[in-house]
Regions:
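Acidic/aromatic-lined carbohydrate-recognition and catalytic surfaces
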Residues: 1-164
């Protein structure tokens, strides 16, 4: 496998590109900064870039809102495609870090559960108990990853969740 013989250069794009700590909803092409470093990465002998989470998130990237678009604080999917083209032109592969065992509280299916409670078709996407309350006063209790309630654990035994991912 190619990865076994590769030299990786890891980047945490939200920090590297100077994105705001909180998602303000404003789209700014900051991810292009990575393309500016392609020559440097190549000179170091790295032939792969490992990008920490770039998907739309509430704050730090590990609290995903949308797996289908990059964080607006980094730009658009088209901006990211251009970065990939530049890196590929330098012989550098791109590997994404995706978090698929939990999402952020801003994830669309969790927002639906917050609004509709028992009536949400997505209530079984998470480990939810309607006989308790969360630290955020949601009117139900749910499992947070490692006890962090801003990171809502997905129910990976649910085939609909697996199909979505």
């Amino acid at each position: 496998m190619w990865a076994e013989n590769s030299v990786f250069y890891q980047i945490y794009p939200l920090g590297f590109c100077g994105a705001p700590k909180e998602n303000d909803g404003v789209t700014v092409n900051r991810i292009g900064k990575i393309a500016d470093w392609a020559d440097h990465i190549q000179r170091l002998g790295a032939d792969a870039v490992y990008l920490s989470p770039i998907f739309e998130s509430d704050r730090h990237g590990y609290d995903t809102r949308d797996y289908r678009k990059i964080d607006c604080r980094l730009g658009t999917n088209e901006d990211f495609a251009k970065v990939c083209e530049t890196l590929h032109a330098h012989g550098i592969r791109v590997v994404l870090d995706g978090v698929f065992n939990h999402v952020g509280r801003g994830f669309w299916a969790f927002k639906d559960v917050q609004e509709k409670k028992w009536d949400s078709p997505y209530k079984d996407w998470f480990h939810i108990h309607f006989d308790g309350n969360s630290n955020y006063n949601d009117g139900f209790w749910y499992e947070g990853w490692e006890g962090h309630f801003e990171l809502v654990k997905l129910n990976l035994r649910n085939p609909a969740v697996v199909d979505y991912l």
